Amino acid sequence: MEAIRSGERAALHRLYDRYSDYAMAIGLRYIPERDEVRDVLQDSFVRIFTSIGQFNYNGEGSLKSWIGRIVSNRAVDYLREHQHFMTVDDIPDEPDEPEEPDIGDILPDTLTEMIGRLPTNYRTVFNLYVFEQWPHRKIAQLMGIKESTSSSIFFRARRMLAKQIREYLKSQET
């Protein structure tokens, strides 16, 4: 950790090699285009390298979480800067569906693809709430929306995702 903090090039390279795939996976949760995610990762690692001195290392898990937060925040910033967010009213409501489908037989990559097909703001709220475990209050502040809007977007995202899952499972039956 000291070599990284002192800016030793080989140590920074090892840090990048160790966490770049993890960072890419997080970026792809928010932004489905790999080229755009690469831009976000470049910005993220610049931020990681320049602020590593202020990071309080408490083991491997704390470093990984810190890197994940930086990538998530930078991805949301990127989406906001490029105006990828839609208003909630721009997306029609999905009809009510009976119950949540069972996702046990769906491969993680397939589920990630489905999440990637959600509208940008739906995908962002869903990822922050489910994977990052942020409260709606914090999501609302980050995205510049009301807390109730974050809750509504999450509910709609969950419904849209459930519909995609049901359609996928139905297609697998035949």
Task: Locate each region found by the language model.
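A short pre-motif secondary-structure segment
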Residues: 125-129
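Structural recognition of an alpha-helix C-terminal capping motif at a helix-to-coil junction
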Residues: 25, 39-46, 61-73
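Short, charged helix-capping/linker segments at alpha-helix termini
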Residues: 5-13, 24-43, 147, 169-174
